[in-house]
Structures are given as structure tokens and as C-alpha cells.
């Protein structure tokens, strides 16, 4: 499996980007939200999902692990393939989709192009309770252990710092950031939160 591609964006299309990672050039299908976050000539790290079929090979790209996990859960639903899953994630942000599934918000889900009430029901049945944020929050302190220690060294209480990391990792603004920007965002927000 190709887990991640690092390179420069040389072309942006309506539903895909083209990345040069020498000596290769990859076309990667992305959601409209992901596409909007990325700029031409930008050096990026894109998490990927490789879809292999007899008649086609496609790469799907994501800005973070959570978006990819929602995509992978979506394609496990009977009747939803990778292109349909990407269309859904272009109609509603992955974290809003996840919350809507937990609330069984038929109206919000069925407003997405190609999803009617029947398909929304299938999605709820298959995915309710499986798209929780627990993984993001619980892994946050481990992933940002050095950052946590740096802030503790500044005189802040470890428990308060760990709680702030978990809380900030669940907000939309953090989740939509590229990995390279997440640590700086966390540092700034934690100091603001704990100093205020």
C-alpha cells in the first residue's frame, strides 16, 4: 500500500491534484475541501488510499488520518465505492459527516449529492458508533509528547497541558491543518488557553 506521498503540487484540477515526487508524477483524487487547502507549487505530505481494480488503479488523497479513516469506513458501506465516498466528503466535511452519523441527522446526510434517505439509513446502520473521535484525542498526547514536555518545562501543569492538547485536537480548525502546521497551532493555542 502507498501510505503517503511527499512532493510538490504542479497541477490542480477540479477533483484531483498532480504531485511530482521524483522520478514519478502522481494524480491523486481529493475532496473539494482538501483541494481548497492546497496551493500550486506547495510542498505537501498527502496521505493516500490505493484503489486497485482489474480495469483501473486510483490514488485517493487526504490531509490527515481522520479524513482517510472516515473514507475507508464509508467504502465499507454496501453501495458506496471510492468515488462515491469522495463525493460525499466533498459535500460535507469529514468531521461534520462523522458527527451527523452519530446524531443520525438524515437531513444533513441526504443533502449530499447522490445520498438519499435509503442510503443515509444504510450509512447509519453500518457506521454509527464506529466513527468516534477517541483515536484522535487519545493519541494526541503521545503524538505531541515533546511539545507537551516543552510547555510543562515553561511551568505549566502536565495534566492541564494534556487536557488542552486533547481538547484542541478535536476542533475543526486543527483537524483541517496539514500535519506540518499542527504542532505550531497546538503550541500557540495551548499557551493562549492556559495563560488566559
Curated annotation (Swiss-Prot):
Cell compartments where the protein resides: Cytoplasm
First-listed, main subcellular location of the protein, grouped into a coarse class: cytoplasm
Annotated GO biological process: DNA recombination; DNA repair
SUPFAM superfamilies reported for this sequence: Nucleic acid-binding proteins (SSF50249), RuvA domain 2-like (SSF47781)
HAMAP family, per the entry: DNA_HJ_migration_RuvA
NCBIfam families membership: ruvA (TIGR00084)
Record protein name field: Holliday junction branch migration complex subunit RuvA
Amino acid at each position: 500500500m502507498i501510505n503517503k506521498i511527499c512532493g510538490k503540487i504542479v497541477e490542480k484540477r477540479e477533483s484531483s491534484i498532480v504531485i511530482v515526487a521524483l522520478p514519478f508524477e502522481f494524480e491523486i483524487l481529493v475532496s473539494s475541501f482538501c483541494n481548497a487547502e492546497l496551493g500550486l507549487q506547495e510542498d505537501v505530505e498527502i496521505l493516500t488510499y490505493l484503489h486497485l481494480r482489474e480495469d483501473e488503479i486510483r490514488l485517493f488523497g487526504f490531509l490527515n488520518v481522520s479524513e482517510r479513516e472516515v473514507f475507508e469506513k464509508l467504502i465499507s458501506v454496501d453501495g458506496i465505492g471510492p468515488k462515491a465516498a469522495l463525493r460525499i466528503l466533498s459535500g460535507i466535511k469529514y468531521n461534520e459527516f462523522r458527527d451527523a452519523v452519530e446524531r443520525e441527522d438524515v437531513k444533513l446526510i441526504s443533502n449530499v449529492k447522490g445520498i438519499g434517505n435509503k442510503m443515509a439509513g444504510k450509512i447509519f446502520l453500518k457506521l454509527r458508533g464506529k466513527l468516534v473521535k477517541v483515536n484522535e484525542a487519545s493519541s494526541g498526547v503521545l503524538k505531541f509528547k515533546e511539545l507537551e514536555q516543552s510547555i510543562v518545562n515553561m511551568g505549566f501543569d502536565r495534566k492541564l497541558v494534556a487536557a488542552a492538547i486533547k481538547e484542541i485536537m478535536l476542533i475543526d480548525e486543527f483537524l483541517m491543518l496539514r500535519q506540518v502546521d499542527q504542532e505550531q497551532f497546538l503550541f500557540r493555542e495551548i499557551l493562549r488557553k492556559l495563560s488566559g
